Curated annotation (Swiss-Prot):
HAMAP family: TruD (MF_01082). It comes from Stutzerimonas stutzeri (strain A1501). Residues 157-303 form the TRUD domain. Responsible for synthesis of pseudouridine from uracil-13 in transfer RNAs. Its EC number is 5.4.99.27. This is tRNA pseudouridine synthase D. InterPro entries: PsdUridine_synth_cat_dom_sf, PsdUridine_synth_TruD, PsdUridine_synth_TruD_CS, PsdUridine_synth_TruD_insert, TruD_catalytic, TruD_insert_sf, TruD_pseudoU_synthase. It holds the Pfam family TruD. One of its GO terms (molecular function) is RNA binding.
Length: 346
């Protein structure tokens, strides 16, 4: 499946040119932002870990083996890209135990940068944001055009699409979700079940967002929209007055789209009709998500790009730095700048 099929139209026009991302791991750096003061004591050992071309789950397995503890005692806030240089926290539950020797977990792909004790384990979703440093190489684009596009993105944000990674190689996760949905069955294996449910849910969201981008309403509130702040999971309905709320203009408040589940869309009539039509077009997946017990949630349609800065280390290199809310994809911003020719797994 193509990028346009899995995501949708761009909001800021055609790409300014082409580039390569992730020529090496250091070209895609991600650092977790965690606003939790660690006490220095307690039965949980927190580890600040740097990973190179290593996914989060494999890192957790390595740490568990080196520590001699079951994998279930290892916690992390979120999954990070494999093809990247990433820094994130892990925690180990070690009641009544001394700090283990973790040297066996380390090599060129995993380094332990810091160890701190704390009273509580690291919860999923506990981080407040992710910081990114991206290096686009083999750049074929006019710098002035890129600068203008980046200024526009800084002022207006980008559509908050789920990225290609969510759907697997050539959309394999979505194809798997459709297969199980057609049979009204769920995968027995927990990780596979989670991955396929996530792909199906993300695809329905992207289809709604694609329609809002196509009609120009992805960044504006309509009567009946459900609005949410950037870092909040709660939402409230938009009446006429809320549609002109000044917080929409400064990218603090946003319209939302559906993360499908039981109960259908709680939006107002016009928005609900759009969202229900998308669900009806993928009825087996929508029903399957409800069958699996997924609860209906919301996700902001517009992605604000925090702290965006950029420079050109060379004529064919663009370096970007920015911060995104958790669960959002850096490639949603990159695709509004350049096309990543031939890179289908970014």
């Amino acid at each position: 499946m193509t990028e346009d099929q899995l995501l949708g139209p761009r909001a800021h026009g055609e790409p300014c040119g082409s580039a390569v991302l992730k020529a090496v791991a250091e070209d895609f750096q991600v650092e977790e932002v965690l606003d939790i003061p660690l006490s220095g004591e307690g039965e949980h050992l927190w580890l600040w870990v740097e990973k190179r071309n290593l996914n989060t789950e494999e890192a957790a397995k390595r740490i568990a083996r080196a520590a001699g503890v079951p994998l279930k005692l290892i916690s992390y806030a979120g999954l990070k890209d494999r093809q990247a240089l990433t820094r994130q926290w892990f925690s180990l539950h070690l009641p009544g135990k001394a700090d283990p020797d973790l040297a066996a977990a380390e090599d060129d792909s995993l380094r332990l940068l810091q160890r701190v004790r704390h009273q509580r384990k690291l919860q999923r979703g506990a981080h407040s944001a992710n910081g990114f440093r991206l290096r686009l190489t083999d750049l074929h684009a006019d710098h002035a055009q890129l600068d203008a596009r980046l200024e526009r993105i800084r002022a207006q944000g980008v559509p908050n699409y789920f990225g290609l990674q969510r759907f697997g190689y050539e959309g394999g996760n979505l194809l798997g979700a459709r297969d199980f949905a057609a049979r009204a069955e769920l995968p027995v294996q927990r990780n596979l079940r989670s991955r396929l449910l996530s792909a199906g849910r993300s695809y329905l969201f992207n289809r709604v967002l694609a329609q809002r981008v196509a009609d120009g309403s992805w960044a504006e509130a309509r009567v009946g929209d459900l609005l949410a702040f950037t870092d909040s999971r709660s939402f409230f309905p938009a009446a006429e007055a809320e549609c002109s709320d000044p917080r929409l203009a400064i990218l603090d408040l946003h319209p939302t789209g559906p993360l499908w589940g039981e109960g259908g869309s709680p939006a107002g009539a016009e928005i609900q009709a759009l969202e229900d039509a998308v669900a009806a077009s993928e009825e087996p997946i929508a029903n399957w998500l409800a069958q699996a017990g997924m609860k209906h949630e919301r996700r902001i349609l517009r992605l604000p790009i925090g702290g965006l800065s950029w420079h050109y280390p060379g004529p064919d290199i663009l370096q970007l730095e920015f911060v995104l809310p958790t669960g959002c994809f850096a490639t949603a911003m990159v695709r509004e700048l350049v096309s990543l020719a031939g890179q289908t797994d970014i």
